C-alpha cells in the first residue's frame, strides 16, 4: 500500500509595511543645522516662521558655530527705531528677504515687466526682532563688535549711567556687560581693533582722566585712557568716527586720538568741516557724508573732500534725516518720507539703499546703487536712531 503523498506546507509572506508618504520626513537636527548654516542669514527671519523647531535651531549656538567653521559669517544690518527721545522701549529690526522671493515669482515678475514699466520690488524688508527689555538708545553710544551690539551709557531715570547692555545678535537676547568706570550720557563710542573706546558725556568734565576709557571684550575689562586735557576735551561730542585706526572726535575743537601711539592731536580744519552736521559713515577706512543729494568722501592724502561718482537713481533726503552704515564693505543708507493712507492717516515710510563702492584710482571712488526700496512703514512719531552691521 503506497504511502500517502505528503502535502507541501505553504507559508504566506508577510505583507510589506507601507512606507511613509510624508513628503518632508523629519531630519536629524545636526543635518538641518548643517543645511541652515549654508543659507544666507537674510532668509532666517522667514525660516524661523516655518516651525518651532526651526525657530529653536536658528537661535541655537550650534548653528553659529557651524557657520563660523564653514566661513559663512556675514554682515547683517540692524536698525533701531525709537519714538523720539522719550520712548523707553525702542524697537529693533533686521534686514531680510521677503518670503515670496521664489524662482516662479521672479519669472512672473519679468513677464509683467514686459507688459508695463513698473519698478520691481527689491524683495528686502525690515523684520521686527522679538527682543525683550531693550534699553533706550537715543542718548546712548551704540557699536557693533563681532556678533554683539553694545548699548553704552545713556540716562537711567534722567541721570547719567555707567550701564552697558549687550545684544547677542545670534540669539536676540540682551545681557548686562561690565559697567564703565564713569557714568555717561550720550557718549561717543568707537571700535578700534576689537576694543571699544568711549568718550565724553561725563557729568564732571573738569576731571580730564574721566574723559575717555576703553573696553576689551576679550578680557571684559575697562581701562582709562590718557586725556587731551579738560580745556579742550569738553563734555559734548557732536560726532566721532574711526579712520585708519585713528579716532576722529568732532567737538568744539576737533581732535584725533591715535591708540597705537597713545597720543592726541588737533584735527585739520579741512576735515573738521562737512561731515559733522550730516549723515555719515566709514567704509573700508574712508569717511563719507551726504549733503543735498551728493555723497562726499575725504581724501586723506590730498586733504580734501571729493564727490562720490556714479550714484544715480536715489531721491533726495534730509541731510540729517538719514542714517548711513558700513554693510560688509558696501554703504547702506536709510531715510524716511511721510506717506498718507487711504483713510487720511499719516505714517512714516522707511527706505533703504545699498551702494557698492569701487576705488578706481587715488582720486576717484565710484558708487553703484544695487537696490533701493521701501522696507518698513511705522507711525509718524518713530525715527531711525541707529543702523549697525554686526557679523553673524
Curated annotation (Swiss-Prot):
Residues 1-12 have a biased composition (Basic residues). Residues 1-27 are annotated as: Disordered. Keywords: Kelch repeat, Repeat, Ubl conjugation pathway. Pfam families: F-box (PF00646), Kelch_FKB95 (PF25210). Pathway: Protein modification; protein ubiquitination. SUPFAM superfamilies: F-box domain, Kelch motif. GO terms for biological process: protein ubiquitination. SMART domains: FBOX, Kelch. Kelch repeats lie at residues 148-194, 195-242, 244-285. Residues 18-27 have a biased composition (Low complexity). Residues 21-67 form the F-box domain. It comes from the Eukaryota. InterPro entries: F-box-like_dom_sf, F-box/kelch-repeat_ARATH, F-box_dom, Kelch-typ_b-propeller, Kelch_1. Part of a SCF (ASK-cullin-F-box) protein ligase complex. Interacts with ASK13 and ASK14. Component of SCF(ASK-cullin-F-box) E3 ubiquitin ligase complexes, which may mediate the ubiquitination and subsequent proteasomal degradation of target proteins. The F-box is necessary for the interaction with ASK proteins. This is F-box/kelch-repeat protein At4g39550. It comes from Arabidopsis thaliana.
